[in-house]
Amino acid sequence: MQIDAVITWVDGKDEAHLQKMLPFLEDKSQVNNKSFRTRFDQVEEIKFTVQSILKYATFIRNIYIVTDNQVPNFIKNKTQGTFENVFIVDHADIFKEDLGFLPVFNCRPIETKLYNIPNLSEHFLYFNDDMFLLREVKESDFFEEGKPIIRGNWLQFNENIFYKRWFNSEKKKNRAGHKKAQEKSAKLVGFKKYFKFHHTPAPM
C-alpha cells in the first residue's frame, strides 16, 4: 500500500499574502493582534514537520506541501539530493474548476480539495504544519486493512451539556472552529454525539 503525506502551510509574514487577505478583513487592525499573529505567522516549523516524517515515517512515498504561491525557505535553499520527494502544491492546482473562489484563507475548503493533488496516493496522512513525529511509526499505526485509524473520543454536543447551555456566551457558541465543524458534521449525518479528533496526523 502506497502512503503519502500532505501538509497544509502558510507563511503569514509574507507581505504578498497579507495584501491578499486584507480586503477580506472587516477590522484590518486585527492583523497586528497576538491571536492573529499566532495563527498565521510561521517560524520555520514546517521544516521540522518534514524532517520528522522523513526520519520516523520511512514508509511515506511523497510529501506534498499545499500552500498559496509560497515556498518554505528550506526548500528554496535545498541542496542537490535533499528533500527529493517533497513537492510544493499550489492552491490553484487543487481548486481547478473553482479558481474563482481563490484566494482562500480557511482550512476547511482547502481540506475538501486535497484529493485533487496531482499523483496523490489513495491513502495518505494529513498533517498540520505544527505536527511533529517524535519516534518511529509504522503503516499499521494509521491504517488497518486499508482503513484509517482515527484517534480521539466521543463527546456530547455543547447544547446537551447543562453548564455549557447556560454559561457559554453567544459569541463563543457561534464561533467557527475545529470543534464546531466536527459537531455540525456529526449532526448532518444524524449522530447524537460527535467524535473529537485529537490534534494528530490524520490518516485518509
Where are these regions (language model features)?
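Short catalytic/ligand-binding loop motif for oxyanion handling, primarily in non-cytosolic enzymes
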Residues: 13-17, 71-76, 96-98, 132-136, ...
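GT-A fold catalytic core of metal-dependent nucleotide-sugar glycosyltransferases
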Residues: 71, 113-157
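A solvent-exposed, charged loop/short amphipathic helix patch at secondary-structure junctions
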Residues: 12-39, 152
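Long, charge-rich alpha-helical interaction segments
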Residues: 150-204
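Active-site-proximal specificity loops/subdomain of glycosyltransferases
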Residues: 31-37, 41, 71-120
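Short beta-strand/loop segment that forms part of the nucleotide-sugar
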Residues: 61-70
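Short, acidic, metal-binding catalytic loop of nucleotide-sugar glycosyltransferases
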Residues: 52-60
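Short loop/turn segments at strand-loop or loop-helix junctions that form parts
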Residues: 4-13, 19, 91
